[in-house]
Each structure stands twice: as C-alpha cells, then as structure tokens.
Amino acid sequence: MTNWINTVSRDHVERGVRGRFTQANHGKPHMLRKMSRGDWIVFYSPKTAYPDGEPLQAFTAIGQVADDEPYQVEVAPDFQPWRRNVDFLDCAETPIRPLLDDLEFIEDKARWGYKFRFGVFRIDDHDLEVIRSAMVTPTAHIAGT
C-alpha cells in the first residue's frame, strides 16, 4: 500500500467527503491512476475555500481508496473531472503546525509549505501514523456507516 497527501481546499474536501470521492490536480487523472485500492489518502487544506478562502493550514480528511480505477464524471459541459472513490474515516480537522517536527516528509521545517505545492505526493508509514493518530479518535469508523 502507498500513502498519499492530496492538497485541496477545505470546501472541496467537504464535497468529496459527502460524495465519498476525491479528485486531484483540478480533475486531471494522472496522480489518481497511480493510486490503488486500499491506499491511504490524507487531505491537507491550505485554505478554507478555493481560490480566495482564508488560510487554514490543516489536515481535513483521511480515508482509503475504495475502487480499482479512476472514473470520469460530468460536473458541467466544460468540466469532466476524474475521481476515485474513498472510504473516509470520522476525524477531526487537525492543524499542521503542532505536527511539523514529527513529519519526516517536511525536510526544511522553515519552508514547510513547499512540499504541498506538488498537490499530490507520497508519504511514508511513519508520517501517515503521525497524522492519522492526531486526526482520528479511538472510536473512529468509516464515515457514513
């Protein structure tokens, strides 16, 4: 299994949680094709809304990829994004700053936001566990069950 971070504004994350899906890189399929069923995906939201929301800098959702291939949907005639289904866990929005020292994927703690410019990227098991334990309560279950 692979662990991923997807950088997405909170309003878009909330839509995905309600619909039990994720998109990446403004609906492009490339990174979604690299994901496999069972992969963990953590959502980091730099802002509350895209494009002009307030700064947030928090992890806003976590779940596992629940399908085998990306699929395309029509949101509007000129926008047909690619998606993956996700089984989301119940979790608490978690500010990133208290976790910075423990996250190994952030090599330069002074410029910690740089990595998120890539949109979607892999993290190791240690970093997933740091984030998951901060976000998920002991009684967490798959959202919507």
Swiss-Prot record:
Record-linked InterPro entries: EVE_domain, PUA-like_sf, UPF0310
Transmembrane segments: none
Listed Gene3D superfamilies: ph1033 like domains (3.10.590.10)
Source organism, top-level taxon: Bacteria
Pfam family, one: EVE
UniProt family annotation: Belongs to the UPF0310 family.
HAMAP family per the UniProt record, alphabetical: UPF0310
Full protein name: UPF0310 protein Mvan_0064
